[in-house]
Amino acid sequence: MNQLNTEKKYDVIIVGAGPAGLSFACSLIDLNLKVLVVDKSNEESISNPKPDGRETALTHNSLKILQKLGVWDLIDPTSVSPLKEAKVFDGDSDSLLNFAAKKSSIGALGYLVPNNLIRQAL
């Protein structure tokens, strides 16, 4: 009995349809590559993600990547919050690193954006 060859060939397979995986996939669009994104979620929940309370802290470089991909303008600016201060703790240690935008020449260390809005824009 002949079996149909249903094997498909891809140049790049990306595991995970979160902001990083989808950004990477978008960055490959103009390179004429066959790209497959694999995720445990179904296509509907990836293309229309529901709010789940998670937020992503974007650095200035991450913001530049989203701008270059043409997706930053698709995110509602009223949902974006500037990250003015960050504190880093080390387990049970009393050590603490504190970063504050007010002590630097930049207005914000980065930006907090609802995860679903980033995924939706991508």
Regions found by a protein language model. Name each.
Residues 9, 81-122:
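Conserved N-terminal helical subregion
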Residues 50-91:
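N-terminal FAD cofactor-binding segment of flavoenzymes
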Residues 26, 64, 120:
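Surface-exposed charge patches
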Residues 16, 39, 90:
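Short beta-strand/turn micro-motifs composed of small residues
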Residues 13, 26-54:
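Glycine-rich FAD pyrophosphate-binding loop
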Residues 4-20, 36:
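Beta1/beta-strand and adjacent pyrophosphate-binding region of the FAD-binding site
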Residues 42-46, 68, 104:
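Beta1-alpha1 glycine-rich phosphate/pyrophosphate-binding loop at the start
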Residues 23:
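Short alpha-helical segment within the catalytic ATP-binding CA
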